[in-house]
C-alpha cells in the first residue's frame, strides 16, 4: 500500500524548469554615468591647468587736450613776462639784467664744475683744498673761469699782469722759465691770429681765425687748465 502511495506521489510530481534569472535592462547605466562623469572631471581639470594668457596693458593715449592747455599756459606766461619787462623803468631793467646775468653765471659755473668732476660746490673757491695733480687742475679750471668773467673790463690786462707776477714770486727760476716760454708761445700765436684777421677783406662771410688747440706748441700751457673755454685766449 505504501508503495502505491509513493508511486502515485512520484507520478504527480512535476519538475518545473528553473526560471532564468531576470535581466535588468537598466543594469550598468549607473556605471556608464560614473565613467562619463570622471571623464568630464578630467577635462575640467585640464582646462583649469592651462595657463591663462595675460593681456598686455594698453598704452596710455597722449592727452592732446592737456598738452594744448600746457602750451597755452606757457604762452600766456611769456606774454605776461614781456609786458612786465616793458613796464620796467631803466633802473629796474638794469637790475633785472644783472639778476639774469647772475643766474646765468651760476649755471655756467655749475656746468663747469660738473665737466671737470668737481663735486664740492659749497663755499665756492674756498671749498677747494687741492693736493693731487687732478685736484689742482679742477681748482685751476674753476679759478680761470671765475677770473675770465671780468675780461671785458679795461682793468683786466693790468690785473692779469699783476696776478701772474704775484703767482710767480713763489716759483723757482726753472719754473718761471717754463711759464715764460708758454706765455711767449701764446704771444706768438696771438700775433699770427691778429695778422691773419687783419688781412681778411670784410664782407666775405668767413669766420674769424681762432687759436688752434690741438697738436700745437701750446699744449703745455693748456695743461694748467687754461683751455677751459674756447674764448679764453683773451685771458693773457
Swiss-Prot record:
Its main location: cytoplasm. It is found in: Cytoplasm. The keyword Protein biosynthesis applies. Residues 28-46 have a biased composition (Acidic residues). GO terms for cellular component: eukaryotic 43S preinitiation complex; eukaryotic 48S preinitiation complex; eukaryotic translation initiation factor 3 complex. Residues 1-65 are annotated as: Disordered. Residues 47-58 have a biased composition (Basic and acidic residues). One of its GO terms (molecular function) is translation initiation factor activity. The keyword Protein biosynthesis applies. Keywords: Cytoplasm, Initiation factor, Protein biosynthesis. GO terms for biological process: formation of cytoplasmic translation initiation complex; regulation of translational initiation; translational initiation. PANTHER family: EUKARYOTIC TRANSLATION INITIATION FACTOR 3 SUBUNIT J. Component of the eukaryotic translation initiation factor 3 (eIF-3) complex. The eIF-3 complex interacts with pix. Component of the eukaryotic translation initiation factor 3 (eIF-3) complex, which is involved in protein synthesis of a specialized repertoire of mRNAs and, together with other initiation factors, stimulates binding of mRNA and methionyl-tRNAi to the 40S ribosome. The eIF-3 complex specifically targets and initiates translation of a subset of mRNAs involved in cell proliferation. HAMAP family: eIF3j. Belongs to the eIF-3 subunit J family. This is Eukaryotic translation initiation factor 3 subunit J. It comes from Drosophila melanogaster. The lineage of its organism: Eukaryota, Metazoa, Ecdysozoa, Arthropoda, Hexapoda. The gene is eIF3j.
Amino acid at each position: 500500500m505504501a508503495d502505491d502511495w509513493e508511486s502515485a506521489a512520484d507520478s504527480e510530481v512535476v519538475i518545473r524548469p528553473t526560471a532564468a534569472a531576470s535581466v535588468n535592462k537598466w543594469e550598468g547605466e549607473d556605471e556608464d554615468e560614473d565613467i562619463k562623469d570622471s571623464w568630464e572631471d578630467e577635462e575640467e581639470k585640464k582646462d583649469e591647468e592651462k595657463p591663462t594668457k595675460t593681456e598686455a596693458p594698453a598704452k596710455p593715449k597722449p592727452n592732446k587736450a592737456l598738452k594744448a592747455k600746457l602750451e597755452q599756459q606757457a604762452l600766456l606766461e611769456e606774454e605776461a613776462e614781456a609786458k612786465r619787462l616793458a613796464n620796467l623803468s631803466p633802473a629796474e631793467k638794469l637790475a633785472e639784467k644783472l639778476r639774469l646775468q647772475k643766474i646765468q653765471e651760476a649755471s655756467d659755473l655749475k656746468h663747469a664744475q660738473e665737466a671737470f668732476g668737481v663735486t664740492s660746490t659749497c663755499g665756492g673757491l674756498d671749498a677747494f683744498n687741492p693736493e693731487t695733480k687732478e685736484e689742482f687742475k679742477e681748482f685751476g679750471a674753476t679759478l680761470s673761469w671765475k677770473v675770465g668773467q671780468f675780461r671785458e673790463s679795461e682793468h683786466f690786462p693790468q690785473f692779469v699782469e699783476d696776478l701772474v707776477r704775484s703767482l710767480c714770486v713763489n716759483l723757482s727760476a726753472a719754473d718761471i722759465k717754463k711759464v715764460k716760454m708758454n706765455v711767449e708761445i701764446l704771444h706768438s700765436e696771438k700775433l699770427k691770429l691778429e695778422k691773419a684777421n687783419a688781412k681778411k677783406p670784410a664782407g666775405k662771410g668767413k669766420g674769424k681765425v681762432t687759436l688752434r688747440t690741438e697738436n700745437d706748441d701750446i699744449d703745455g700751457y693748456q695743461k694748467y687748465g687754461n683751455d677751459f673755454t674756447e674764448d679764453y685766449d683773451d685771458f693773457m
